[in-house]
């Protein structure tokens, strides 16, 4: 099977304009942009046949080309990263069987998380897979802090007994009681913004209408669920590492703190 990896990157963002070009301090003490850190992660995935950045902004294109990334320009009218990845596939003459959508807001994603995601897609009848993490007390506390501060941050997910996603939300789901927090027991799973698609599912995505829930939550993956297409969740392990996403400028020091421990 041939595999394409696409990093969708847009400059305009209501919460964090210019996020792909945001800089933070890496584990070696040097400043690196979010998009270059994500590209370096992609380069470690040797089983991927081709890797590209898909953007609609010339600033991102020129910056990515400066560190050797291959870039394709996409329409400015696309609504989200999945639509951008689907257009990138079309620009590659649709000659790939599996497509990985590696969004640039998770530079701490371990490579084995992406490997496991693709393995699950290949061996199963699923059309879309995505990784999730059981929240530990520290990450759950950060989710609650973001919520109480009115920041739209990480995404949580609930799923059925077969690990098919039931719902994704920017709210904290399921409801977590104070007793759960105190006893170190919670059932909250953090969604990592990476997807693997069978080509036919991704091609279908741009033809599907945006549903109410997708618009309300601002979560692109809900388009699949609202159109009765399953998303298989793959429970991931950090193997002792820590994880956090870069959704807001306030996340930069959190990620830098984690990187200093690596």
Where are these regions (language model features)?
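Conserved alpha/beta core of the MobA/IspD/sugar-nucleotide pyrophosphorylase nucleotidyltransferase superfamily
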Residues: 94, 168, 182-262
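Short phosphate-binding loop-to-helix
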Residues: 58-116
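A short, N-terminal amphipathic alpha-helix
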Residues: 31-50, 67, 226
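Short glycine-enriched, charge-decorated loop/helix-capping segments at active-site entrances
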Residues: 20-26, 72, 210
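Hydrophobic targeting segments
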Residues: 2-7, 42, 51, 248
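Short, high-confidence coil segments that cap the C-terminus of an alpha-helix
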Residues: 48, 94-96, 123-126, 229
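Conserved core of the sugar-phosphate nucleotidyltransferase
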Residues: 109-208
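N-terminal nucleotide-binding beta1-loop-alpha1 segment
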Residues: 1-18
């Amino acid at each position: 099977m041939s595999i394409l990896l696409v990093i969708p990157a847009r400059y305009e963002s209501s919460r964090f304009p210019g996020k792909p070009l945001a800089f933070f301090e890496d584990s070696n003490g040097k400043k690196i942009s979010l998009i270059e850190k994500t590209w370096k992660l992609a380069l470690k995935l040797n089983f991927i046949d081709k890797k590209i950045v898909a953007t609609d902004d010339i600033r991102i294109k020129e910056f990515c080309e400066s560190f050797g990334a291959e870039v394709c320009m996409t329409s400015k009218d696309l609504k989200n990263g999945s639509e951008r990845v689907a257009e990138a596939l079309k620009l590659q003459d649709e000659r790939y069987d599996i497509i990985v959508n590696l969004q640039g807001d998770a530079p701490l994603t371990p490579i084995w998380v992406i490997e496991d995601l693709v393995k699950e897609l290949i061996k199963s009848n699923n059309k879309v897979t995505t990784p999730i993490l059981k929240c530990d007390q520290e990450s759950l506390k950060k989710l609650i802090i973001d919520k109480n501060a009115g920041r739209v941050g990480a995404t949580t997910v609930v799923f059925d007994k077969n690990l098919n996603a039931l719902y994704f939300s920017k709210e904290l789901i399921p409801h977590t009681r104070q007793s759960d927090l105190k006893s170190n027991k919670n059932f909250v799973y953090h969604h990592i913004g990476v997807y693997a698609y069978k080509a036919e599912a991704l091609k279908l995505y741009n033809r599907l209408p945006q549903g109410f829930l997708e618009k309300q939550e601002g979560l692109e993956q809900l388009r699949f669920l609202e159109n009765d297409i399953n998303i298989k969740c793959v429970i991931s392990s950090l193997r002792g590492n820590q994880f956090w996403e870069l959704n807001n400028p306030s996340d930069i020091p959190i990620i830098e703190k984690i990187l200093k421990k690596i």
